[in-house]
Amino acid sequence: MQRAESELSTEDWRRVFQQAAKMGVLHLHLTGGEPLARKDLPELIRAGRDAGLYVNMITSGVGLTEDRLAMLVEAGLEHLQLSFQDLDEVSANHIAGTRAHAIKLALVPILKRYPLAFTINLVVHRLNLDHLEEFIALAEELQPDRLEIAHVQYYGWALKNRSLLMPTEEQVQRSLPIVDAAKERLKGKIHLEAVFPDYFGSFPKACVGGWGRQTMLIDPAGQALPCHSAAVIPGLQFDNVREHDLAWIWQSSSAFQRFRGDAWMSETCMTCPRKERDFGGCRCQAFMLTGDPDAIDPVCSYSPHHGLLKELRVSQPEALPIWRG
């Protein structure tokens, strides 16, 4: 978390968006943290649209009044993703750490009155995965354009709470036919996208579409990162948009070069027919699980550390949550 006084100014962001558009960037995703915390959010959205970018915002919805929503849409907001934590209000508020569930439900019909693409996000884990079928039914009533169901990714605070959040094998297996049936039932009405849990897989995901291939994250203070968790890897130097042009960072920054391409890969990955599909998997996950960012992602069945995941899949229901602060 950065102090507010260290954040980029409105004019800084305007310049960054213009540079991004010149590079061929198409999508601007405003996420957080919470984008609504920025008082200049309408100006940022307008700057993104003026640069020719498609503007999407991921939000908790807390603090989003209809008047403010109207301002954001008028400024050019095109897509809003609203995050939910569970079906039940008590459970959802407990997971969120705030009384937000009723606010989100009340916001949905307001969103539907505006010319705005609308996605519901649900992050699933051991505490809410058993409610998946009922949550999908709720989503059908709310009628978003998209429903994204993603298993929690074990980085940051989720990593600290992994023993609490890790679903059981039985929970995961029960969820698969529920998702498949919903995809078929909702075809042509709601696009359902589901992200399978890494720790239960045999092959890694193509994290952010490959390191330094299609995604650039700019944090509030202007640091440019190849992915959300890249700062966990020791030795990486992240250049700042206050000091360098965005195109230079993309093309020449040592952090973006570090795992771009395949020169860094082990022989196992280099000769694997899947390397153009998963690009070697997640470097942050490899580091957090093995201590070596160059290691084969342990999710991969070819990794000598793959057996570690079986041990980590053991859920500990008695574990207490670890909160910030």
Q: What feature does the model see in each segment?
A:
Residues 33, 123-125, 287:
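Short strand-loop junctions, especially beta-strand C-caps/beta-turns
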Residues 34, 63, 86, 153, ...:
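Flexible, active-site-proximal loop/turn residues at the rims of small-molecule/cofactor binding pockets
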Residues 11-15, 64-67, 103, 241, ...:
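Short, conserved clusters of charged catalytic residues that mark active-site
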Residues 34-35, 63, 158, 214, ...:
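Gly/Ser/Thr-rich beta-alpha loop segments that engage phosphate groups in nucleotides
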Residues 1-79:
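Conserved alpha-helical substructure of the radical SAM core
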Residues 26, 212, 268:
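Exposed loop/turn and edge beta-strand positions of beta-sandwich/beta-sheet ligand-binding modules
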Residues 231-325:
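Flexible mid-to-C-terminal extensions adjoining Fe-S/redox cofactors in radical SAM and related proteins
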Residues 3, 8, 54, 70, ...:
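Radical SAM enzyme [4Fe-4S]-AdoMet core and its adjacent flexible, acidic
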